[in-house]
Each structure stands twice: as structure tokens, then as C-alpha cells.
Amino acid sequence: MALVEGNNGVSGGAVSFSEEQEALVLKSWAIMKKDSANIGLRFFLKIFEVAPSASQMFSFLRNSDVPLEKNPKLKTHAMSVFVMLRKAGKVTVRDTTLKRLGATHFKYGVGDAHFEVTRFALLETIKEAVPVDMWSPAMKSAWSEAYNQLVAAIKQEMKPAE
């Protein structure tokens, strides 16, 4: 299954992960999508718990007196980020989205350490969101691989906006 689609994708073509990995991501997503807004918010709260200074990378959080968990702009942003891999029932991200993500992450100085914190927060959030008997090393690996591929694609596009 292609994770990145479009004319150029990653390294000149689509990057894929196994059907088993895709099935695990889709199975867990089917459980989480009913509460994706709250799960997305918990994901960002986990990021800020691990790396409090990360909140300053978001213009809508700087100088805000609204508690993070009640910030409507964070809730909206969290929802959009959390469902990104699940557009149109596929585990894909379009080239145009990657270009925008790359430019945005470049603009705000996102680096490897930020991506690592985000990976940790994502995996912990999913682990807490799915039933205990569903979470497994294979599911963790599947989500980690999907995330790794997304990050690799974003990094290829990390340059100033044109």
C-alpha cells in the first residue's frame, strides 16, 4: 500500500509498507476514529507533557491564557493532524500536502528531536486509545513505520515555501 502518492512521492516513487502493517493501522483507526478529536488532543497534550517548550512553536498557543486542553485552535489542529494518514480510507498523504507540511515544519525549525518526541507521543496515545488486547508489538511497529515514512517524506519537502 502506498503511503505517499503523487508524481514524485519519496525517492522518485511511492514508499510502501506491508499489507499486515496496513491492516493493523486500519483496524486500530476503526476503533479510534469515533473519538478522533479527543484522541488527537491527547496526542498534542502528550507532546507538550514530554516537551513543554514545543507549545511555543504554535502561534495560536503563544501568549495564550487558555489552558491547552481547552484551546479551540489546538483542538482543531489536533484533529487535522491526527486524521492526516486516514484521508479517503487510505493510508496516504498527497504531494501537495507534503509540500505544505514540509514548508511549515521548515519555517518553525522542526528538527529530528521534535519528530522523535512526536513519534513517542503518537505511539503512547494510540496505545492508550485502543483496547489493551489490541495493542501489540506488531501494531506498534506498523504505526511506527507509517510515521517514519511520513516524516521521511516531510523532511524531503522541508525547504522555504515557494
UniProtKB/Swiss-Prot annotation:
Cofactor binding notes: Binds 1 heme group per subunit.
PROSITE patterns reported in the protein's UniProt record: GLOBIN, PLANT_GLOBIN
GO cellular component terms, A-Z: cytoplasm; nucleus
Binding residue positions for heme b: 59, 73, 77, 100, 104-105
Tissue spec. comment: Mainly expressed in germinating seeds, seedlings, roots, flowers and leaves.
Site residues by UniProt (Homodimerization): 140
Highest taxon, organism lineage: Eukaryota
Induction entry: Accumulates upon salt (NaCL), drought, cold and asbcisic acid (ABA) treatment and in response to osmotic stress (mannitol). Induced in nutrient deficient conditions (e.g. K(+) and Ca(2+) deprivation), but down-regulated in resupply conditions.
Quaternary structure, from the entry: Homodimer.
Role this protein plays: Phytoglobin that reduces nitrite to nitric oxide under anoxic conditions (e.g. during flooding or in waterlogged soil). May not function as an oxygen storage or transport protein. Has an unusually high affinity for O(2) through an hexacoordinate heme iron because of a very low dissociation constant. Promotes tolerance to low potassium K(+) conditions.
Protein name in UniProt: Anaerobic nitrite reductase NSHB2
The organism's taxonomic lineage, starting at the top: Eukaryota, Viridiplantae, Streptophyta, Embryophyta, Tracheophyta
